[in-house]
A protein has these predicted regions:
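Catalytic loop of short-chain dehydrogenase/reductase
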Residues: 102-106, 114-119, 123, 149-187, ...
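A short, exposed helix-loop element centered on a Lys and neighboring polar residues
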Residues: 135-136, 179
């Protein structure tokens, strides 16, 4: 994975399950040391299956090195301790994947935003603010080594109405983080990108499909595996022209076509740009 003989060191936030777990597994399969963060340490800690320790063990089995770190991304002190541990234990950080996101059980419940619980907006804490805090700690490590990639997981919810305004604002926010952090990081040869994932075949969506089979008929044929985005991040980090993509908001399925990457089942997931809209790239103007 790494451009030199050292295996890359990555931090993937929110990796007990879902997209974060899949990304961590894909990076581990490429040989990386992966710090996986989350709050779920034991089965039953969350309504959905998965723990950070289970993810770390799967990374080990795939040939990487998984390191589970319990971290509540609402707590800045815990996040600071995470990156201090990475620096002391590994001496470097090559990839940060900002994925941890608060997803309320009522997120996809039909109805206007005011009819849903107010704490749906906590996605702007764990999901937006948390990504800034993690990047703030990661950036100095990458700047020091003059190499690194900060990736944000995002979606077409930044373009169209999807799950309500809180969800959309979080996606737009991390896209803007990628654009603006790239400006600050460019002279240090550190890249920042945001990746729009498509529909994901995760533990959460599998449960929803079981509850509403007719509504989600045909979903599997279009869905991306959680590992798919991890394969893209691996390819991005290896790309000698990575800095040309820094600051961009990338549709994952389209990036996969550029790199010739397929999903774990051999399929080429489709882009939903025509149906859901596409990303708006940054204007080149810079105002200090």
């Amino acid at each position: 994975m790494s451009t030199d003989k050292q295996a890359a060191v990555a931090v993937v936030t929110g990796a007990s399950r879902g997209a974060g777990k899949g990304i961590a597994l894909a990076l581990g399969a490429a040989g990386a040391t992966v710090y996986v963060t989350g709050r779920s340490q034991r089965d039953g800690d969350a309504d959905l299956p998965g723990t950070i320790h289970a993810t770390a063990r799967e990374i080990d089995a795939l040939g990487g090195r998984g390191i589970a770190v319990a971290c509540d991304h609402r707590d800045d002190a815990q996040v600071a301790a995470l990156f201090e541990r990475v620096a002391q234990q590994s001496g470097r950080l090559d990839i940060l994947v900002n994925n941890a996101t608060f997803l309320h059980d009522d997120l996809i419940k039909p109805g206007p935003f005011w009819s849903k619980p107010l704490d749906l907006v906590n996605i702007l804490d764990v999901g937006l603010r948390s990504a800034y805090v993690a990047s703030w700690h990661a950036a100095p490590l990458m700047v020091r080594q003059r190499r690194g990639l900060i990736a944000f997981t995002s979606s077409f919810g930044a373009s169209c109405y999807m799950h309500g305004p809180g969800y959309g604002a979080q996606k737009v926010g991390v896209d803007k983080f990628a654009k603006d952090m790239a400006v600050d990081l460019r002279e240090h040869n550190v890249a920042a990108v945001s990746i729009w994932m498509g529909m994901l075949d995760t533990e959460r969506t599998q449960r929803v499909m079981q509850q509403h089979p007719e509504q989600y008929a045909g979903f599997a044929a279009m869905a991306e595996s959680p590992q798919f985005t991890g394969r893209l991040i691996d390819a991005l980090y290896r790309d000698p022209r990575l800095m040309e993509k820094s600051g961009m908001v990338l549709v994952g399925a389209e990036l996969a076509q550029q790199y010739g990457i397929r999903d774990i089942d051999g399929r080429q997931p489709p882009s939903h740009r025509a149906m859901l809209g596409g990303p708006v790239q940054a204007h080149p103007a810079k105002v200090e």
